[in-house]
Structure formats: structure tokens, C-alpha cells
Amino acid sequence: MKIAVLSRNRHLYSTRRLVEEGINRGHEVKVIDCLHCSMNITSADPKIHYHEEVLEDFDVVIPRIGASVTFYGTAVLRQFEMMGVFPVNESVAITRSRDKLRSLQLLARKGVGMPVTGFANKPDNVPELLKMVGGAPVVIKLLQGTQGIGVVLAETRKAAESVIEAFMGLKADILVQEFIKEAGGADIRCFVIGDKVIAAMKRQGAEGEFRSNLHRGGTASLVRITPEERRTAITAAKAMGLNVAGVDLLRSSRGPLVMEVNSSPGLEGIENATGKNVAGMIINWTEKNYKPWKTKTRGRG
């Protein structure tokens, strides 16, 4: 197969590993920076130009699109789909998962467990919003935040009101969620490929830090997940329409709660924590499921 990896940096661990595993299995692999692509959008003969070269004859595209370039990156991915190239994760599924509010609404529709979450637009609604999620402490999240940036733990009602009003004053869209104290600053990253959880790790936040993101100094370790956690992760990935996903769960007194479904999960943490060849598993799944023009939208909403 001829595989395109959409990534802005060929030296990133995840990109390197996908290239290595693709080449090891006899495939031709090319790393493409989506921001350097231009598109000829026609119904008869859609094309993508890259550094004055026309990209042709690709069988598969593996998107590794960062949150900051979601709009243009998914536009390029859609163009590949228009050309009949099989996407490991389709453009619609990625945009679903990148919209925190939309993704939570889709998960709620499927009956997936989540922290109680509130959303409002006006400062007048703040008292009702806090009451809705059970009062302080609460977690306040920017809808556009990634890697733990734009996430605040407000331990008192007064602090919560101040933070929410400040964000609203900046015209920022936010979610307010109940704080799951029993999680102890840890979460579970379940790596889903197809309809299976192929690896899982526990991420523990640094001392005094409630966010468990590895980018925020958290640590990762191998973990055994329960059948309920496995089912929840698979259901969450399917709700987004994602073939490859990192599903972040919190362990709570009422069962697993989904925090986020990541459409471009990093490979370094999960491979180091579990010792599994996750990149190879992605290529293996692609080999088994690839078909030309197999670009029909999965999932609904």
C-alpha cells in the first residue's frame, strides 16, 4: 500500500513509529504536512498539491492532525476522501471528537457515563450552573483547550464564580464539570483500534496536580481494566465514529466516566507503559480493513 501520514512534524515519536512500522511491513509511507497542501476542489478530478507535486495513487491516509490545525487539517483529509483514499480516521469523526460539547452530547445520547456537565452562555446563569453540577469543587474547562491547558479546579463556590465570570468576560466558551475526588488525580487511557481495547495505561498527575496529562508532568503505568471499562471505551469510540482513539476514563463510585475521546492519541506514553507495538497494530488493522473508496461516514450526529 501507499500510505500518507498527515503530520506537521516527521520527527514526532508517533509519526516516526507509524512510518517505521509501515516500511517494516513493505509499504511506501510519505509524511505530509497538511498546512503545505493546496487543493483543487472539483467534482470531476479533485487533487491535492504538495510542494508543487500532485499527490496521487495513495491507498490510505493516517491523520495525525493537531488541535490547532483541525479546520485546515480536516479539509485536507476530506479532499483525500474525495479522491477515494481510505482514512484510518475519517474527517467527520475527527471534527466530532474535537468539539468537546458536541462529543459529550453524542456520548450522552449513547448512555455513556460522564461527569455531570453544565454549559451556559451568560454570567446570570452561573449560580444555577454550579448548582446543576453539585456545587464546588468543580472543574472548569475551555472548549478549545488541549493537553490539560485551559482546565481549572475551583475548590470553592466563590473561586468558581470568579473563574467562570472571567472566562465569560473574555468571550471564551467553557464547560463546568463535577470534580471526581475518588479518582485521586488519575485517569485511564484506553487505546481503541477497531472494536477492541488493545492497550491501557493509568496516568497519575504530579504531586498536588489534579490533571493527569503526561504533558503536565504526569506518569504512566500499565493497568488492568475491568470489562465495564472496556465496554465503555469501545462504545465511546464508536459514538464518535473513530477507528483509532484514545478514550480517557475516570474511575468513580458510580463506574467509569468518560472525560474525553482523542482522535489523535499519542503513541509514546502507551507504548512505553505497556511494552506493546501499538503503531504496528494500527498498520495491521489498516491492512485488514483497507478498501478503495471506503469513505462512508461512520456514526451519527
Swiss-Prot record:
What cofactor is this protein dependent on? Mg(2+); Mn(2+)
Q: Where does Mg(2+) 1 bind?
A: D248, E260
The question of whether Disulfide bond is a record keyword is answered with no
What Enzyme Commission number(s) apply to this enzyme?
6.3.2.-
Q: Name one GO cellular component term.
A: cytoplasm
One example of the protein's molecular function in GO is: metal ion binding
Protein name, UniProt field = Probable alpha-L-glutamate ligase
This chain's source organism reads Marinobacter nauticus (strain ATCC 700491 / DSM 11845 / VT8) (Marinobacter aquaeolei)
